[in-house]
A protein has these predicted regions:
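Long, structured protein-protein interaction/assembly regions in large complexes
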Residues: 145-149, 217
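Phosphate-binding and hydrolysis-coupling loops of NTP-dependent motor/remodeling domains
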Residues: 1-34, 101, 209-367
Length: 503
């Protein structure tokens, strides 16, 4: 395939053509989503069993083989069971086509919103990068084609790819997440000059494809559809309803500026490695009869080489991964993996190489996700400078877990000379486990009224003593600990289930 050579030689500045299959004459039929040809956006229709998903997979792979990941990247949205997305990203093995910038395979509202925020963030980032490039180059306007030319010429140093957003079976997306679909179409329209291409695939266009989608779809590919009306909707002719064979399709661009009948290429066939020319010793074993005729020949090496090595698709992806790794090529991921449901303090500390400072009580309580800035980081609470803290949450939301993490993270990093906890657990009494910790003065429960009264008398006395002690240090606890030769511990009064305490 010589893909790295192809990546070096092929540039999407003037054309983004990629083989899709063959036409009626047996010539290679190419789809070119450059805005001067068939692009930037389009529709694909085909009933179940028509070969629609295979055509999409073939097109993605064709682009990936021919264009550098810095020139072309993909977001795959797949609700048909994840077949298209899984073809290019195996989350179990970690293998992923180098060109993949993100995949969505379920209709979880939170995940949809997260992805949409990330896509919008990417558009804003591209606008900033293009504005910077305009100032550097002196160009009056910058679009994706001009920017990529500047990058190829070394004027700018950050690659920006054509971003293909491909949605297989968007009818379900539109039905269950209509706002997301509307935002996606709007994003594609706004992002046209920024290198965004939207390809929507459906089984039946009628009632699903609205005027906004039609008006923004320059090319249309129609495989076998169930009814003539569907074919008429797509390509203004009933011919697609009479298609007999899987993978056959009609391609229409604009108002019949280009019209062709073709057969999609197929990349799911078995991959059989071809022999490479080399000098070899003949190890063939021949069986002959009594008069010297060969009755049977066995060549173990040849038979071993002719054995199938899986699908062509997976082998080509493995090859492209290898090429990208050798050249240290990485595509910018538009969103990170979602934060897992269960995380441990120790794992977060290790993951982010977090180190606690002496006398800075800044316990780890979790990890935060910021899709707008395509960022995840460790989440801490600064008890020295943050003032008081209120934790809200319904039953079962994780309040106890948060308090537990806060205490645990604090006492594993700070001794009793730095911090003292006084805990009033009027809830499940889960915080009882900290009773014997040296940093914990006491853990008080709901029926221990006298202990509660004594605690607040003690706290009031400590406040009065510290007011005098800190007088020469601007009345500030942190300033005292920084400038004085003595240190005072931070006092943390924690009330779990404040409603019960208040009553």
């Amino acid at each position: 395939l010589n893909s790295y050579t192809r990546w070096q030689n092929n540039t999407p500045i003037n054309s983004i053509q990629a083989p899709l299959g063959i036409d009626k004459q047996g010539n290679i039929l190419k789809l070119d989503l450059h805005e001067k040809f068939h692009g930037p956006h389009g529709l694909i229709a085909g009933m179940t069993g028509s070969g629609k998903s295979e055509l999409i997979i073939t097109y993605i792979l064709s682009l990936a083989v021919n264009y550098h990941p810095h020139d072309v990247s993909f977001i795959i949205i797949d609700y048909k069971g994840g077949g298209v997305a899984r073809a290019f990203e195996n989350r179990e093995t970690g293998k992923k086509l180098p060109h993949i910038a993100g995949t969505i395979t379920n209709l979880d509202t939170a995940e949809m919103n997260r992805a949409l925020i990330s896509i919008d963030s990417e558009l804003r980032r591209r606008q900033r990068v293009f504005n910077k490039a305009r100032n550097i180059s002196g160009e009056s306007t910058i679009d994706i084609y001009k920017y990529q030319k500047l990058y190829k010429n070394g004027v700018v140093d950050e690659p920006i790819s054509h971003l293909f957003i491909i949605c297989d079976e968007f009818a379900e997306l539109k039905a269950q997440q209509p706002d997301f679909m509307d935002q996606l179409i709007s994003t594609a329209r706004i992002g046209r000059s920024l290198g965004v291409h939207l390809i929507l695939a459906t089984q039946k266009p009628s009632g699903v494809v609205n005027d906004q989608i039609w008006s923004n779809s320059r090319f249309r590919i129609c495989l076998k559809v169930q009814e003539k009306a569907d074919s008429m909707d797509m390509i203004k002719t009933p011919e697609a309803a009479t298609i007999k064979n899987v993978g056959r399709f009609y391609l229409q661009v604009g108002y019949n500026e280009f019209f062709a009948y073709g057969l999609s290429a197929y990349c799911g066939a078995s991959y059989i490695p071809t022999d490479k020319p080399k000098r070899k010793v003949d190890t063939t074993l021949n069986f002959i009869d009594d008069v010297g005729y060969i009755t049977k020949s066995i060549d173990d090496e040849k038979e071993q080489k002719m054995a199938s090595c899986g699908e062509q698709l997976s082998n080509i992806i493995d090859y492209l991964i290898e090429v990208a790794n050798e050249e240290k090529i990485k595509v910018r991921q538009l969103w990170l993996e979602k934060i897992p449901a269960l995380i441990y303090v120790e794992d977060l500390v290790k993951k982010y190489n977090y180190k606690s400072e002496v006398c800075e009580i800044n316990p780890v309580i979790g990890e935060y996700d910021d899709p707008a800035n395509q960022l995840q980081n460790i989440l801490t609470v600064n008890l020295n400078h943050g003032g008081n803290l209120i934790v809200y949450g319904s039953t079962g939301s994780g309040k106890n877990t948060l308090l537990n993490s806060l205490i645990y993270s604090t006492i594993t990093n700070h001794d009793s000379n730095e911090v003292n906890f006084y805990i009033l657990d009027f809830g499940s009494e889960i915080l009882r486990i900290y009773e014997k910790a040296p940093q914990v003065g006491d853990v008080i429960f709901i029926n221990e009224t006298e202990k509660v009264n004594n605690l607040f008398k003690t706290i009031n006395q400590k406040m009065a003593d510290r007011k005098k002690l800190f007088a020469k240090y601007n009345g500030d606890f942190n300033y005292y600990n920084k400038k004085s030769d003595k240190k005072e511990p931070l006092i943390v009064v924690m009330i779990n289930n404040f409603e019960a305490f208040y009553e």
